[in-house]
Amino acid sequence: MEFDRHGLYKPHGPANWYKKPSESFSQTCPFSPAAKNEDELSLANFPVTRQQTDLLGRFQSNYVGHVVEQEYRNQGSSGGMVTWVAAELMRKGLIDGVLHVIAIADPQSDGRFFKYRIARNQQELNEGAKSRYYPVELSEVLQLIAEVPGRYAVVALPCMTKAIHLLRQQDPVFKERIPFTLGLFCGHMKSAGFVQSFAWQLNVPLKAVKEVEYRYKNPDRPANWYNAMLKLENGEIQNRDWWHLVDGDWGAGFFMSSACNYCDDVVSETADVAFGDAWVEPYSSDGRGTNVVIARSELVDTMIREAIAESRLQLEEVDGAFVEQTQAAGFRQRREGLAYRLTWAKKGIRPVKRVVADANRATKERKLIYRTRFWISKWSHRMLWLGRKMNMPGIYTSWARAALSFYHGIAYHKGNFSEMKKRYVEFKK
């Protein structure tokens, strides 16, 4: 797996490999029409569950809250639950290691800012806390698992979690060695170009960047006030609120992978447990961070309930409707929006989704939003590439300023031109 010119991973191999059909590959790729879908995998993984909804899939219980013990909450972007569950599985002797994403110590020599690594103790687990909106791939760590016997948990996005379960069905070694998956809620995957955009807008050369933090945490500010921070090789720190970035609205879809347009899983439906942010009040205003948790496996649910009883976790049980509300925008994009996108003419392989193609489900206003989001995601890659090639950052930032101003006008102000102009002027300040 290597980066393409847009900072997204693509498989690379001999020319004859591309031309030779592979049944096992077709059944393992999470976006392949030949692969099992999330409903089929979830039923196989969790044949008996207490609850099920169309949007959340199968589950035992849902919770909202945070970790009380130690520094889990402070170290993470949200409530600390992802690292806590991984650590608890390790503490109980149920796993020997955790596949998670960490920052690379020397990104300039490596060519990446983040990668998957196997954590085998608490200190290494803590290094994987926080959100990383950066493309990663699993081939390196999966090779290690194949070579080194043990029991492992994987922390992954919905599509990668699905891929792990498809791989487990194909290969008995991975079925034995990966007994747990810890899924993350997902809006979409960003390309590596997002970091380049940060650097341009903060007026620092990308080659001088040592660390990237997408959500710099400040307990005195609302959790949904994202702040991007870059730490430079000389120790200098530059940061800016996402609201003041020309591509800082997540919903606009800047640098989104094209595959994300055809994904219908927001909440990691195939994972043993899944985690997201509680994007509803009063939780979204709590800068300390709050998790929403979906426990699908009975074992993990029991583990969580025991920790609540021991006052190690401050979690409140909630119903499915509450969880769905916290991710309402993501579900619109992956249900109503996907139904509309599936009606568009498309060359090549046609994705097979659980959502039925429907051009009448969305209103005209929503259709314009979905169209705009699609084209912003498509052209953001191209305009950033052109800006780099010409060594003219303004090619990208000027285009992005106009694109986001238009998006804000149609998404939040019913197409009001004066509001578009107002937002455009704000970005220029």
Model-identified regions with their sequence ranges:
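Non-heme iron-sulfur electron-transfer modules
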Residues: 1-66, 280-283
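Gly/Ser/Thr-rich loops at beta-strand to alpha-helix junctions
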Residues: 77-82, 154-164, 188-190
